Curated annotation (Swiss-Prot):
Signal peptide: none annotated. Its EC number is 1.2.4.1. Heterodimer of an alpha and a beta chain. GO terms for molecular function: pyruvate dehydrogenase (acetyl-transferring) activity. The keyword Oxidoreductase applies. Pfam families: Transket_pyr (PF02779), Transketolase_C (PF02780). It comes from the Bacteria. This is Pyruvate dehydrogenase E1 component subunit beta. NCBIfam families: PRK09212.1, PRK11892.1. Its cofactor is thiamine diphosphate. The pyruvate dehydrogenase complex catalyzes the overall conversion of pyruvate to acetyl-CoA and CO(2). It contains multiple copies of three enzymatic components: pyruvate dehydrogenase (E1), dihydrolipoamide acetyltransferase (E2) and lipoamide dehydrogenase (E3). It catalyses: N(6)-[(R)-lipoyl]-L-lysyl-[protein] + pyruvate + H(+) = N(6)-[(R)-S(8)-acetyldihydrolipoyl]-L-lysyl-[protein] + CO2. Keywords: Oxidoreductase, Pyruvate, Thiamine pyrophosphate. The gene is pdhB.
Amino acid sequence: MQITVREALRDAMQEEMIRDDKVFVIGEEVAEYQGAYKVTQGLLEQFGPKRVIDTPITEYGFAGLAVGAAFAGLRPIVEFMTFNFAMQAFDHIVNSAAKTHYMSGGQVKCPIVFRGPNGAASRVAAQHSQNYTACYSHIPGLKVVAPYSAEDHKGLMLTAIRDDNPVVFLENEILYGHSFDVPKTIEPIPFGQAKILREGSSVTIVTFSIQVKLALDAANFVQNDNIDCEVIDLRTIKPLDTETIIESVKKTNRLVVVEEGWFFAGVGASIASIVMKEAFDYLDAPIEIVSGKDLPLPYAVNLETLALPSESDVIEAVKKVCYYSI
C-alpha cells in the first residue's frame, strides 16, 4: 500500500482527534480551505469549527492562543503556512512553550505541536526558503522532528501529539506529494531513534528530511566505484540518536553529514563535534559536511540550484573521505 506524506500527516491528526477530544488544529486556512497544502483535508467536515480553527494572518496571535490552551490542558496542533512565518511566533515558541515546564519546576506542561513546511521548495525566494532545523534544535525544551518517509511522518506525528511538551515538526513542501510504501498499521515511533536505510561498510552518510533522497541516490551512484555507503535517516534531530551514528562510524571509519541548512552552527557541525569527541580514534578521514551555501536563497532557478546541496555534492564528499580520485 502507498500513501503520500500529505495523507500520512492528515491520517495521524485524524486518528488522534478521534482518540482524544482535547486535540485540535489551528492556523491559517486549515479549515475551509483544508490547509495551504491540503494536509488538513476533511478535518473540518469531520470535527467541526471548534476543533479545526481558521485564524487571521497573525502567527503571533494564534500561536500565543494555542500555547495558552496547552497550558490549560488542551493539545493544540499549530499549522504554520511555512516556518518562515513562524518567526512572528518565535517568542511564544521559545520563551513560553519551551521554557515554562522547566521554570515551573515541572508543574506546568505544554503539550503542543508546531508543524508546517520548512526549508526550500521551488523558487519561493529567500524569505520563504529558510531552513530552521538548527535554530529550533538549539533551544532547550523543544523536541525537533524532521522525517522523510510517509510512515515516519505518521508515526512521529502520533508521538508528537501525545507528547506532554512542545514538539517542532518540520515538514517539507516538496515531500507532501511524494508516495511511499507503508504497512497496513503504523504505530507511534519513539523520538530519538534514527533509521539505517542502507547498510554499508565504506562510509557513513547521516542526513534527514528531503536530503535523504540525495544521500540514497549518491550512495547508489558510488556503488559503481565499489564505495559501499551506510545511509542513516535521523528522523528526529532533538533528541539525537548519537548511538546509531557512533556505532556506524566505528564500522565505516568515515562520515559525511548532509543538511539543507547553512554550515555555520548547523546540525552537521554539532554531529561532527559529537563524533570527534566520541569516535575520534575510529576516523580514517576528516568529517565532511554538505550543506546549503552561506547566502539567502536566490529566486532564479539556476542560482537556487547552485545554492542547495546536490547529489553531485554528496558524491564528491563521499569520494573525498574515501580518498577516491574525483
